[in-house]
Amino acid sequence: MSRILVDTSIWIDYFEDKDSYTIIDRLVIDNLICTNDLILAELVPFFHLQEKDELVEALMALQKYEIRIDWPQLIHMQISNLKHGINGVGVPDLIILENVLVNDLILFTKDKHFMLMKDVFDFKMFDYKELKRR
């Protein structure tokens, strides 16, 4: 199975209520979760200020996929979004999507922009709801 890039939206929900995403624990144990510097930059400062050092260490220990930004590609992606009526997608989301595409990762998110972009770009999303039904 490909690595699963857990988006900030899922991590925030998980840390607020671990029972809401128990699958995260299993994915960590199975060593399937990965991250990147953008997601870490969104999460780590908040936990650092709360002095949750063990949590910061655990996040930093996850396999990390380097972000190599291809700016012309991001511009092309945003143009494709706009042509398909998908407005308001921020550059950070485009960078995350590019990281997913380049490294053939599975994205675990609840962000509506990614749900919309799924119809435009060929990438895999982790379907936690489907997994819960089994």
Located regions from the model:
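A generic structural signal for short hydrophobic patches within well-formed alpha-helices
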Residues: 11-12, 40-43, 114-115
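Structured helix-beta-strand junction loops
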Residues: 29-31, 58-62, 84, 103, ...
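General small-molecule cofactor/ligand-binding pocket signal
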Residues: 34, 65, 124-126
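Active-site-proximal, substrate-binding regions of enzyme catalytic domains
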Residues: 38, 44-77
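Short, hinge-like loop/turn segments at secondary-structure boundaries
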Residues: 50-54, 82-83, 124-127
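Active-site neighborhoods of divalent-metal-dependent phosphate/nucleic-acid chemistry enzymes
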Residues: 65-110
